[in-house]
């Protein structure tokens, strides 16, 4: 018996079968020795486990981990995991990782993997010289890297010693090929994305309606005048702008709102509307046309802010600067627009040309800006007696007194919820000859500049009685409205005034209780009281219940007023 046979002579057939997972027990010593020699010959390439180890091929463990456990344990009910098994598996994995790291193709694999990461995450920004950031991680640059790698390998060929491992070499080559394909796919995806973006931009430029942009640029082509170079209106006998006329005061070129405030809407002293109204009083217009040049120094003699020449009854002419105001629905550039339409002194202001003014507001709300532009929007009335050659009525630029009356009547009838529904907007637009957009803009401005000052004034006065308005609370269903429609034909709009002192007399409709404002603690000295329906409820929770009031005299109860 040889030396190898003596080594395994003391071990029985059962012990060898248990350790190696062999199910047969009639094995002799020679067969055991031959099988063990086969295991040793499998790892003679220098990368496997050392001779004498009982582990099998490490590549098979990855595909079938159970084979590794069955190699050391029996198929019976014994535990399938022991510390020795984990130690052996960790050692084998460590040797496999070291063999991969020491492979000559590993630096090329790392370089290609980094290129794929850069191609995925790097933005494709074009620099000034025309090169993009993707040139570093492009597929074409990999050829240069490959040539550099081959040159470096050939230079260091005599310094490196490598034992061939066909299985590991095949894995490395397949990994490099897979990453190479992935890099090509990433480059193709970026190319398709860039092509799509370019075609999309070209399509937008071809189909985008640029006529509106061109109109805005044409309207704002005049150079803006600095506010410091403008003073009061001077007297000049020349109708041109080149005369010695002193420019009048010019407000800021952009103002998003054009509805007059209730505080200065009724001023008749001739002072110009300052602040955000962007309009001038027309009370001293005739006096400015007929008076001498000394009257132009007074602030009350400012005429209408309109371009062109104003002719007086005495024959004297004065040159007006072209003043235009940008509204939210007109031009967004906020520039100046020069109009040359003369406005006669004998012409009533109700029949003034709409093209010569953009923002006009008279004391008492006789006129108000529509919020329309020269873009050809038509009103809701498709045909009318005053229609143009196209059969459609031209949208007026200035609100008439009747339109203002209807709007104000509806607003003060529905102060608790000043949001008209779509049907009511259509009805108001049909009655006034305006567009729905103009009606909507008027109510937006009115809620901010008429209703909100009333609320602020009541809050400053320390009383919250009649003015309890639902602020910023829209209906879920726009078809319903808490107030009546102005199509009833009532002339009650003339009785309404934005003055809060006369509001109680002019608004007889009771207001509903705003329970949503009473969710937490009472405010403004309002005493808390318990809910009779739920006496044990925390007073800090839920809604409060109003005290008993005569139902015939007042249907709704306002909880914002102090109670005894």
UniProtKB/Swiss-Prot annotation:
Query: Carries keyword Nucleus?
Result: yes
Enumerate the UniProt keywords alphabetically.
Developmental protein, DNA-binding, Homeobox, Nucleus
Primary localization class, coarse: nucleus
Name the phenotypic consequences of knocking out this gene.
Answer: Worms exhibit severe posterior disorganization during embryogenesis (Nob phenotype). Mutants exhibit Q cell migration defects, affecting cell position along the anterior posterior axis. RNAi mediated knockdown abolishes nuclear localization of ceh-60. RNAi mediated knockdown targeted to the intestine represses expression of vitellogenin genes; further repressed on ceh-60 mutant background.
A single GO molecular function term of this UniProt record: DNA-binding transcription activator activity, RNA polymerase II-specific
Record localization: Nucleus
Compositionally biased region (Low complexity): 219-230
* SMART domains in UniProt: HOX
Instruction: Indicate yes or no for the key word Cytoplasm.
Output: no
Which Pfam families does the annotation name?
A: Homeobox_KN (PF05920), Meis_PKNOX_N (PF16493)
- DNA-binding region residues: the ranges are 392-454
Which PROSITE patterns does UniProt cross-reference here? HOMEOBOX_2
The segments labelled Disordered in the record are 40-59, 216-270, 293-313, 328-397, 455-503
Comp. bias (Polar residues): 328-344, 381-390, 455-469, 494-503
Cellular-component GO terms for this entry: chromatin; nucleus
All copies of domain MEIS N-terminal, residue ranges: 133-218
- Which BP terms does GO give this entry? animal organ morphogenesis; brain development; embryonic pattern specification; eye development; lipid homeostasis; mesodermal cell fate specification; muscle cell differentiation; neuron fate specification
Note the SS bond partners. Answer: none
Q: What does this protein do?
A: Acts redundantly with ceh-20 and ceh-40 to perform overlapping roles during embryogenesis. Required for postembryonic development of the ectoderm, including the Q, V and P cell lineages, playing a crucial role in ensuring that these cells and their descendants undergo their invariant patterns of cell division, migration, fusion and morphogenesis. Has a role in the mig-13 pathway to promote anterior migration of neuroblasts in the Q lineage. Required for multiple roles in regulating vulva development.
Q: How does it assemble?
A: Forms a heterodimer with homeobox ceh-60.
Regarding protein family, the annotation reads: Belongs to the TALE/MEIS homeobox family.
Q: What is this protein called?
A: Homeobox protein unc-62
Q: By which gene is this protein encoded?
A: unc-62
């Amino acid at each position: 018996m040889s030396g190898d046979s003596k080594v395994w002579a003391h071990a029985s057939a059962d012990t060898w079968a248990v350790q190696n997972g062999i199910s047969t027990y009639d094995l002799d010593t020679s067969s055991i020795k031959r099988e063990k020699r086969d295991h040793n010959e499998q790892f003679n390439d220098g990368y496997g486990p050392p001779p004498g180890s009982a582990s099998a091929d490490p590549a098979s463990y990855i595909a079938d981990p159970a084979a590794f456990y069955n190699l050391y344990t029996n198929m019976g009910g014994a535990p399938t995991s022991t510390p020795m098994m984990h130690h052996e598996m960790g050692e084998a994995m460590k040797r496999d990782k070291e063999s991969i790291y020491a492979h000559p193709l590993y630096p090329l694999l790392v370089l290609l993997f980094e290129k794929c990461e850069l191609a995925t995450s790097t933005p494709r920004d074009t620099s000034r010289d025309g090169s993009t950031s993707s040139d570093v991680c492009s597929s074409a640059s990999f050829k240069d890297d490959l040539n550099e790698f081959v040159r470096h390998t050939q230079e260091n060929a005599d310094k490196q010693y490598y034992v061939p491992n066909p299985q590991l070499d095949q894995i490395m080559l397949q990994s490099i090929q897979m990453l190479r394909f992935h890099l090509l796919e990433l480059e193709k995806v970026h190319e398709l994305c860039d092509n799509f973006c370019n075609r999309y931009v070209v399509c937008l430029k071809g189909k985008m309606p640029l006529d509106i942009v061109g109109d805005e640029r044409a309207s704002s082509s005049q150079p803006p005048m600095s506010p410091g170079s403008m003073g009061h209106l001077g007297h000049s006998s020349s109708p041109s702008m080149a005369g010695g006329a002193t420019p009048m005061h010019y407000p800021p070129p952009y103002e998003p709102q054009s509805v007059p405030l209730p505080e200065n809407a009724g001023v008749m002293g001739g002072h110009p509307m300052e602040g955000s109204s962007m309009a001038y009083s027309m009370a001293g217009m005739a006096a400015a046309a007929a008076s001498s040049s000394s009257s132009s120094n007074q602030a009350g003699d400012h005429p209408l802010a309109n371009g062109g020449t104003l002719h007086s009854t005495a024959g004297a002419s004065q040159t007006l600067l072209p003043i235009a105001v940008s509204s939210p629905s007109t031009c967004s550039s906020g520039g100046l627009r020069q109009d040359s339409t003369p406005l006669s002194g004998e012409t009533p202001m109700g029949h003034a040309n709409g093209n010569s003014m953009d923002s006009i507001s008279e004391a008492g709300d006789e006129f108000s800006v529509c919020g329309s532009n020269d873009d050809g929007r038509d009103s809701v009335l498709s045909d009318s007696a005053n229609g143009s050659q196209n059969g459609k009525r031209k949208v007026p630029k200035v609100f008439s007194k009747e339109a203002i009356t209807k709007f104000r009547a509806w607003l003060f009838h529905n102060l608790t919820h000043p949001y008209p529904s779509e049907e009511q907007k259509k009805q108001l637009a049909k009655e006034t000859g305006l567009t729905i957009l103009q009606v909507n803009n008027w109510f937006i401005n009115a809620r901010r500049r008429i209703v909100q000052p009333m609320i602020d004034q009541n809050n400053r006065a320390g009383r919250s009685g009649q003015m309890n308005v639902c602020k910023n609370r829209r209906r879920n269903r726009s078809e319903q409205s808490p107030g009546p429609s102005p199509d009833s034909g009532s002339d009650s709009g003339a009785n309404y005034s934005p003055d809060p002192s006369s509001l109680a007399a002019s608004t007889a409709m009771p207001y509903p209780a705003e329970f949503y404002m009473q969710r937490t603690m009472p405010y403004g000295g309002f005493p808390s009281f318990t809910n009779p329906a739920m006496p044990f409820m925390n007073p800090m929770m839920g809604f409060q219940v109003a005290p008993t009031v005569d139902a015939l005299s007042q249907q709704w109860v306002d909880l914002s007023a102090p109670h005894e």
